[in-house]
Amino acid sequence: MSEDEEKVKLRRLEPAIQKFTKIVIPTDLERLKKHQINIEKYQRCRIWDKLHEEHINAGRTVQQLRSNIREMEKLCLKVHKDDLILLKRMIDPMKEAAAAATAEFLQLHLESVEELKKQVKNEEALLQPSLTRSTTIDGVHTGEAEAASQSLTQIYALPEIPRDQNAAESWETLEADLIELSHLVTDMSLLVNSQQEKIDSIADHVNSAAVNVEEGTKNLQKAAKYKLAALPVAGAVIGGVVGGPIGLLAGFKVAGIAAALGGGVLGFTGGKLIQRRKQKMMEKLTSSCPDLPSQSDKKCS
């Protein structure tokens, strides 16, 4: 059984796929968002034990989300190639929501790390004598603007998790799960796109092959007509030169068949008979083969 024969129409799998895209996965994403809010709250308040528990619970949700996406991916792989565009439209909103939720979750820790780097850099700068002063550009003190921006960042950035806390280790595990989830969502999108590109490539090759076959068929038909037209003339010329029964034999020899009539006229007649016989054979052969659709017919359809 070929791969295409194992595929099914989207309408047969649509209810199961929509159950994932509209119910199961959105529910997981909503649960993940609640974990994110709790994690931000516990980390900001420095409640490390609660933060550790929330990291573990969030990790379970991420694993469940990954499992559900894989199950949906199995269904997507069964969809017939003709329905891949509709399938892509169906799963794209879910894919974008999952990618955005994962990126937003990872951004929590990223902002904390960036803020920590800024704090270390500022502390190093304070240890050195100040060599520059704030300058004024268009009436705005750049030093004051940078200080205001830094204080605003400190308000929203989360405090660093102490390395001696279990929450630090549980976050690393959760972060790895989130990154794997992000890769899974990306791979699923690439899988559907690659299937469509593969189909488009096959279609292009089929169209090119059809053009080549069509042109080759025309050339063969022309060559066959030229060959058939030459048979009576060649038979007449050779039959006229040789004459008699041998001339007739020579006339048939040109056509590829021997018979016994006689003379130059009979040589022409022998070639003519073979021409008709070969013409009938060619018509019978071409009529038994299916017509190749031309490129103009495809465009019109």
Curated annotation (Swiss-Prot):
Q: Which UniProt keywords apply?
A: Acetylation, Autophagy, Coiled coil, Cytoplasm, Cytoplasmic vesicle, Endoplasmic reticulum, ER-Golgi transport, Lysosome, Membrane, Mitochondrion, Phosphoprotein, Transmembrane, Transmembrane helix, Transport
Chain positions with Phosphotyrosine modification: 156
What is one cellular component GO term in this UniProt entry? HOPS complex
Residue ranges of the TM segments: 228-248, 254-274
Tell me what topology the record assigns in the membrane. Multi-pass membrane protein
The Gene Ontology terms for molecular function here are: protein kinase binding; protein phosphatase binding; SNAP receptor activity; SNARE binding
Its PTM note reads:
Phosphorylated at Tyr-156 probably by ABL1. Dephosphorylation by PTPN2; regulates exit from the endoplasmic reticulum.
Q: Where is this region: Necessary and sufficient for localization to autophagosome?
A: 228-274
Would the keyword Ribonucleoprotein be found if you checked this record's keyword annotation?
no
User: What subcellular compartments does it reside in?
Assistant: Endoplasmic reticulum membrane; Smooth endoplasmic reticulum membrane; Endoplasmic reticulum-Golgi intermediate compartment membrane; Cytoplasmic vesicle, Autophagosome membrane
Residues carrying N6-acetyllysine: 41
Q: Which residues form a coiled coil?
A: 49-128
> Which InterPro entries has this protein been placed in?
SNARE (IPR010989), STX17_SNARE (IPR028676), Syntaxin (IPR045242), Syntaxin/epimorphin_CS (IPR006012), T_SNARE_dom (IPR000727)
Report the main location listed first in the record: endoplasmic reticulum
Q: Where is this region: Required for interaction with COPB1, TMED9 and TMED10?
A: 273-301
Instruction: Give me the Cytoplasmic side stretches, as residue ranges.
Output: 2-227, 275-301
Q: Which residues carry this modification: Phosphoserine?
A: 288
Q: Note the superkingdom of the native organism.
A: Eukaryota
UniProt motif Endoplasmic reticulum retention signal: location: 298-301
Outcome of swapping residue 156 to E: Alters interaction with COPB1 but not with SEC24C
Q: How does it assemble?
A: Forms a SNARE complex composed of VAMP8, SNAP29 and STX17 involved in fusion of autophagosome with lysosome. May interact with VAMP7. May interact with VTI1B. Probably interacts with BET1, SCFD1 and SEC22B. Interacts with PTPN2 and ABL1; involved in STX17 phosphorylation. Interacts with COPB1. Interacts with TMED9 and TMED10; the interaction is direct. Interacts with RUBCNL/PACER; promoting targeting of RUBCNL/PACER to autophagosome. Interacts with VAMP8, SNAP29, VPS39 and VPS41; these interactions are increased in the absence of TMEM39A.
Family the UniProt entry places it in:
Belongs to the syntaxin family.
* Summary of the function given for this chain in its UniProt record: SNAREs, soluble N-ethylmaleimide-sensitive factor-attachment protein receptors, are essential proteins for fusion of cellular membranes. SNAREs localized on opposing membranes assemble to form a trans-SNARE complex, an extended, parallel four alpha-helical bundle that drives membrane fusion. STX17 is a SNARE of the autophagosome involved in autophagy through the direct control of autophagosome membrane fusion with the lysosome membrane.
**Could you identify this protein by its name?**
Syntaxin-17
| Species of the source | Rattus norvegicus (Rat)
Q: What is the lineage of its organism?
A: Eukaryota, Metazoa, Chordata, Craniata, Vertebrata
